[in-house]
Design a protein with these regions (language model features):
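Short Cys/His-rich metal-coordination motifs, predominantly Zn2+-binding knuckles/fingers
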Residues: 146-149
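Extended alpha-helical scaffolding segments
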Residues: 1-132, 156-518
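Short functional micro-motifs and their immediate structural scaffolds
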Residues: 151-154
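Flanking scaffold residues of small Cys/His-coordinated metal-binding clusters
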Residues: 138-141
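Beta-strand elements of modular eukaryotic interaction domains
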Residues: 134-136
């Protein structure tokens, strides 16, 4: 099985037909493919592989002028590069199997230490993973997994594997650690953003940063070489380790875990691999990550994280900021956009709690060029805060309803201690879910308001958005707070009063209004 020339990548053609494509086909005939047909974390991992090969084949692009020539140069360059390095993409090569380490030893008998490859799939019921969508995997480590699925899972596992306890193996006589670090794409449950174009080839070019843009994040660090060109010989191979973990190209296809598949790809040996320094330790952010200011006074920076309870569109204003020299902003790919260019933004994320995978998500947003203007994105952000204000008010109203109806509620909340937020979350959950579902169905109103800025329609569109928020909060309150008994009616009235009360105007805003009135 050759990862470069044999088909294993799930794609969709321009006609909408699903098929498997090879790495060579994606990079040389991608104009015939519409998109990938994979899970969110798999999309990010595959795109990193495509970009790594494209950079290596082109030895660039070094600047914007070279970036513009990528469509003409990449097909031939990729074909020649993959042919030159064909042996390094052999999955079962005797001495240099792709993304594996030959000659690993478990330190046990010949049969012991080999585990099922199902552990590489976050979506499979194996180890601590949930069985919710994979009942077949319960107590069934011997099931047959197709080799193409194993390759995709192996690549994604290297990028997104969370740290924790791990089996130990021997690499060149040295035993690996029993504790592992995070893969480069999973720290802080970071959000990843990719541009999408009309076909897969255009999408790859859109996300291929020039070396000028890469230097914004990596400064004087070396661009490096792909891991298959400088594969470490052992844990003591400092030069190859540095290339793999501290350079742009080296990190795109990481070796977070060292592994070796058996002859039929059904089992594997796996241990801790190379440690990849994260953003929290001062290392540059990943090219698809979003960096925000956490503390304006201290100018503390952090990665934009995915929280399963918060829809991605509420963070959109931070994602579309063009990354600046100090590293704050969205993905590097935004720097290739012209000022008047609209774009589709794919937002993918994987949420984790320590070593447990919680959820994956993916959304696609149409971003008008005007929305990327700072003043307009600030309006979008302000209106998102307005929607969150209504959500908070809905939660307080539901609490008032419960307190009036249940005399012991306040005591339970007070005695809940550290689990207070969990208790309140359960109380708010149904109402909040209904509210946000209604709001998301009407996101077009927010986009229409933003598009109307500077025109006579700005006030009507804003009022329509605000009216929808108010009505959605009221509908959610009515749905979860019953009115069947006198006590319920009294409790409903208390909560309704808080929900419908006019919002308090901040003192600063009151002063501005007085000045305006003269």
């Amino acid at each position: 099985m050759n990862v470069a020339f044999d088909p294993w990548i799930p794609v969709v053609t321009l006609e909408g037909t699903p098929k498997l494509a090879s790495l060579r086909e994606v990079l040389t005939e991608g104009q015939n493919l519409a998109d990938l047909a994979v899970r969110p974390h798999e999309r990010v991992s595959l795109m990193r592989l495509f970009l790594c090969v494209a950079h290596a084949a082109l030895d660039g692009p070094k600047d914007y002028d070279e970036w513009c020539k990528v469509p003409k140069r990449l097909p031939d360059a990729a074909r020649k590069y993959l042919t030159t390095w064909k042996d390094s993409f052999e999955l079962f090569h005797p001495t240099k199997p792709w993304l594996q380490v030959a000659g690993l030893e478990s330190g046990k008998s010949a049969e012991e230490g080999w585990g099922p490859v199902s552990k590489l799939g976050f979506f499979m019921a194996s180890g601590a993973n949930t069985t919710l969508f994979d009942h077949e995997g319960m107590n069934n480590d011997e099931r047959i997994i197709q080799l193409r699925s194993t390759i995709l899972s192996m690549l994604s596992f290297q990028c997104f594997s969370p740290g924790g306890l791990i089996s130990q193996v021997f690499w060149d006589g040295i035993q690996t650690s029993k504790s592992s670090k995070d893969g480069p794409c999973v720290s802080a449950s970071m959000i990843h953003c990719l541009l999408r174009r009309g076909d897969l080839f255009q999408t790859i070019q859109a996300n291929l940063p020039s070396y000028e843009d890469i230097r914004l994040s990596y400064a004087e660090r070396s661009v490096g070489r792909p891991i298959w060109e400088m594969m470490p010989d052992s844990l003591k191979d400092d030069l190859a380790r540095t290339n793999a973990t501290e350079t742009y190209l080296g990190r795109l296809v990481p070796l977070t875990r060292i592994m070796q598949l058996n002859c039929d790809g059904a089992k594997m040996l796996m241990g801790d691999g190379l440690p990849y320094p994260p953003f929290s330790d001062g290392f540059p952010p990943e090219p698809t990550a979003v960096v925000v200011i956490r503390d304006k006074e201290k100018q503390e920076r952090g990665l934009l994280s995915y929280r399963p309870g918060k829809a991605l569109w509420r963070e959109l204003a931070a994602m579309i900021v063009k990354r600046r020299a100090e590293g704050v902003g969205g993905p590097l790919s935004l720097r290739s956009l012209t000022e008047d260019e609209d774009c589709d933004l794919i937002v993918s994320a994987l949420a984790r709690d320590q070593a447990t995978i919680l959820d994956t998500t993916e959304s696609v947003y149409r971003i008008p060029s005007k929305l990327r203007i700072p003043e307009r994105s600030a309006v979008y952000e302000e209106e998102v805060r307005k929607s969150e204000d209504y959500a908070r008010r809905l939660g307080w109203s539901i609490e008032d309803y419960r307190k009036t109806l249940d005399g012991g509620w306040e005591g339970r909340v007070k005695n809940a201690g550290p689990s207070k937020n969990d208790l309140l979350g359960k109380l708010h959950g149904t109402g909040a879910s209904q509210y946000w579902t209604a709001v998301e169905k009407n996101l077009g109103l927010l986009m229409a308001h933003d598009a109307a800025l500077g025109t006579e329609d700005v006030v009507p569109t804003r009022d329509a958005w605000h009216k929808m928020l108010r009505q959605s909060a009221r509908d959610a309150y009515e749905a979860v707070c019953g009115q069947e008994t006198p006590r319920q009616i009294k409790a409903f009235t208390e909560g309704w009063r808080k929900l419908t009360a006019p919002p308090k105007v901040p003192e600063a805003q009151q002063k501005r209004r007085k000045v305006a009135k003269g």
